[in-house]
Amino acid sequence: MGILYLVATPIGNLGDMTPRAVETLQTVDLIAAEDTRHTGKLLQHFQITTPQISYHDHNRHGRTQELLAKLQAGQNIALVSDAGTPGISDPGQELVAACGEANIEVIPIPGATALIAALISSGLATDRFVFEGFLSTKNRPRQQLLQSLAQEERTIILYEAPHRLLATLTDLQTFLGQERSLTVARELTKYHEQFWRGTLQTAIAYFTENTPKGEFCLVIAGATPEDRPSFSEENLRDELRSLMAKGLTRSQASRQLAEETKLPRRQLYQLSLELEADG
């Protein structure tokens, strides 16, 4: 059996490439790369001549089985992404899971990860955090996630592209409130690296005046008790009445309101029963 190595590569500054990563890429039989042309430049810089094979979102299902067969035949393979740690908002999880099922050894070669670099530089709480990658561009799942993040007490980390940054900041302000603190990290480890700190409201103003360029990582403060909305029993009764008047059953209305308020569904269902008893 061969070994699968998960090799982290620099996210911008080539000086962040570790000696262990270079040695691993030099000695494996094959490098599975998200973009072979991009990785080829990295390999050339470090005088690494190991052959490559592509492994990306569009071919990973079929390629996973191909790589698995090579590993089972005794080849050692290194998996790399375009930048940072493979499997973090990049292909890799499926191959690692397949190796686990086949009892193939997986060894991580740690290194740069944008989300950790942004987090530790943010000045926000680092003891508990949640990473959500890129927000969905589809309206319903995007709104559902933002709704849940509004009450998330852990520090929140997101990635975003420059052309979507303002839309994401605006949506975050809608769901999390304009005074929520955040740090916007841009072009981490690169020449134009920047950290901007403020609130969602001031972030929107700043990036409206300063056109977003580069790759962004948003680190957002978790919710505090003051951020949590309070609901009176009468408010909840009114909401249930409204939902049931639209044709939802007691169960459906209770479930929907539970999702919106984060209150226990059983509590809301009991209120709906009381509404019926009250006539």
Swiss-Prot record:
Entry GO CC: cytoplasm
Any Gene Ontology biological process: siroheme biosynthetic process
Any Pfam family matching the protein: TP_methylase
**Where in the cell?**
Cytoplasm
Supply the enzyme class, top level. Answer: transferase
CDD domains linked: RsmI
| One Gene Ontology term of the molecular function aspect | uroporphyrin-III C-methyltransferase activity
* Source organism, top-level taxon: Bacteria
Q: Spell out the Gene3D superfamilies in the cross-references.
A: Cobalt-precorrin-4 Transmethylase, Domain 1, Methyltransferase, Cobalt-precorrin-4 Transmethylase, Domain 2
InterPro entries in the record? 4pyrrol_Mease (IPR000878), 4pyrrol_Methylase_sf (IPR035996), 4pyrrole_Mease_sub1 (IPR014777), 4pyrrole_Mease_sub2 (IPR014776), rRNA_ssu_MeTfrase_I (IPR008189), SAM_MeTrfase_RsmI_CS (IPR018063)
Its EC number(s): 2.1.1.198
Function text:
Catalyzes the 2'-O-methylation of the ribose of cytidine 1402 (C1402) in 16S rRNA.
Q: In its UniProt entry, what is this protein called?
A: Ribosomal RNA small subunit methyltransferase I
